[in-house]
Amino acid sequence: MLSLIGSNENDIILDFFSGSATTAQSIMELNAENTDSYRKWILVQIEEEIQDHPEAIKKGYKTICDIGKERIRRAGKKIKEESPLTTADLDTGFRVFRLDEGNYEDVKRSPKEFKQDQLDLFLNNIKTDRNDLDLLFGCMLDWGVQLSLPMTQEVVDGKTIYTVNDGDLVACFAEKVSEDVVKAMAEKMPLRVIFRDSCFAQDADKINIYETFKQKLDWSDQEVVKNIRVI
């Protein structure tokens, strides 16, 4: 199907009504048949509940999205099992994102709206129900970093460090990070760095972190401001 509609080897195919994910399966099969094909896919589907398929409900599928995800998993597994030699490097993985509002509270207020005993409520502008991955992927979107890039995690001094694509972006969102954590992040020679404001016990700690990256990566003052983001 896809080979007949004019798509090229490196195209991204977007299916805005993906249903049971037929498009994803077709692209993976095409990539498996043609080793020069690196087509990617993006599927969009409303999380519509299943109502008229009792057998699917019995198997634990609650929405059309559930069926689509399972189809992608099974199709990828089958493709690799049928052609293990030629599909060893074939990427059949995928990530699932749910559309939501932004990660930040609206803390914009006029001076008249502020009360002295309420100022502490505005110190943290990140919504309380957001986790590290919410913040990480939100920053990736803001920075234009591909959401499909490989990602790793490691724990240093009890704090989790996230590394995207071997250093395209390195992030830590834990509170009061130590010098060892900062050095471990700098050792990755990242292009971009993200911290949460609560990573720092005091403002002086931010300055020390900036200096660490300047020395390790030979960044100028302008590059530090550009490449390090505190949210």
List each model region and its residues.
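A phosphate-binding catalytic loop at a beta-strand-loop-alpha-helix junction
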Residues: 11-30, 140
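Accessory, often C-terminal, charged low-complexity segments
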Residues: 2-10, 30-231
